A protein has these predicted regions:
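Glycine-rich tight-turn/loop motif centered on a GG-T
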Residues: 1-11, 39-57, 130-140, 176-177
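Phosphate/pyrophosphate-binding betaalpha-module
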Residues: 8, 12-27
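Short acidic, glycine-rich surface-loop motifs adjacent to enzyme active sites
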Residues: 21-54, 79-81
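Glycine-enriched alpha-helix->loop->beta-strand junction motifs that scaffold or abut catalytic
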Residues: 24, 74, 104-106
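Hydrophobic faces of well-ordered beta-strands that scaffold small-molecule active sites
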Residues: 28-30, 75-80, 108-110, 151
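Solvent-exposed loop/turn segments at secondary-structure junctions
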Residues: 34-37, 83-85, 114-117
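Alpha-helix-loop-beta-strand connector modules within alpha/beta enzyme cores
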Residues: 51-78
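Preference for extracellular/luminal or secreted protein segments
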Residues: 59-60, 69-70, 88-191
Length: 191
C-alpha cells in the first residue's frame, strides 16, 4: 500500500497518468494498490478477517471520481490480473469483479486461468455471476452500457471494424498447429 494523502497523490503518483490523458491515452490499466489515506471503503479480508482497504482497481473513488471526473479520462479502464493475491486472497473473485465494474472498470483481465477448453466452465461461472449481478441490481445496466460504449469507441478508433472478416475455425486450426505442435510441446516441457 501507499500512504500518500490526496494532495501527495495528485502532486506525484498521478502526474504520469494526467500527462498521458492530456496526450490522448485511450486505455489505462488499474493497479491493485491500496491508498488507505484516500480510499476509506473496505471489505473484510477473506485471508485474515482484517479490514482490507479497497485497492484502486476496486475503488470508485479512484476510477470514477479521480480518473474520470477530475482528470477527464474518457477511455477504457482495464484491470491488472484479477487473479493476483491482492484481489483473490483478500476479496475473492465474485465480489471483486462486481466491485471493479461498479468502480468504473471496462475490461476485467484474467479473471480465471484458462489452460484448456475444459476450463471454459470457470469462465462461464464468472460471466453468469456478472449477469446475475446485473439482473438483481448489484451492477446497474447503465454501468455495463457505459463500458460497452467505451470499448466499441476504442475498437472503432483502432480501425478494428474495418478489418476483413476472418475464418475463425481456420485461424484456430492454424494457431493450434503452431502452438500445439510437437516441437513447441517439447519446449514447454523443458521450461
Amino acid at each position: 500500500f501507499i500512504n500518500s494523502t490526496y494532495e501527495q497523490l495528485m502532486a506525484f503518483e498521478i502526474v504520469p497518468f494526467a500527462e498521458a490523458i492530456k496526450n490522448g491515452c485511450k486505455m489505462i490499466m488499474s493497479g491493485h494498490i491500496q491508498f488507505p489515506n484516500i480510499e476509506k471503503e473496505a471489505v473484510i479480508s477473506k485471508q485474515d478477517k482484517s479490514r482490507y482497504t479497497l485497492p484502486a482497481t476496486l475503488s470508485k473513488r479512484f476510477l470514477t471520481d479521480i480518473l474520470r471526473n477530475e482528470l477527464g479520462f474518457e477511455g477504457v479502464v482495464i484491470t491488472d490480473s484479477m487473479q493476483m493475491q491482492a484481489i483473490s486472497s483478500h476479496v475473492g473473485s465474485e465480489l471483486a469483479n462486481i466491485l471493479a465494474i461498479n468502480a468504473g472498470v471496462d475490461i476485467l483481465l484474467m479473471c480465471t486461468s484458462l489452460r484448456s477448453l475444459k476450463d471454459e466452465a470457470k469462465l462461464k461461472a464468472i460471466i453468469d455471476n456478472i449477469v446475475s449481478a446485473v439482473e438483481d441490481g448489484r451492477i446497474p445496466m447503465e454501468r455495463i452500457d457505459e463500458s460497452t460504449l467505451r470499448v466499441l469507441k476504442l475498437k472503432k478508433a483502432l480501425g478494428l471494424f474495418d478489418a476483413p472478416a476472418i475464418d475463425v475455425e481456420a485461424a484456430v486450426a492454424n494457431a493450434l498447429s503452431i502452438v500445439g505442435c510437437q516441437e513447441n510441446r517439447a519446449a514447454e516441457r523443458l521450461i
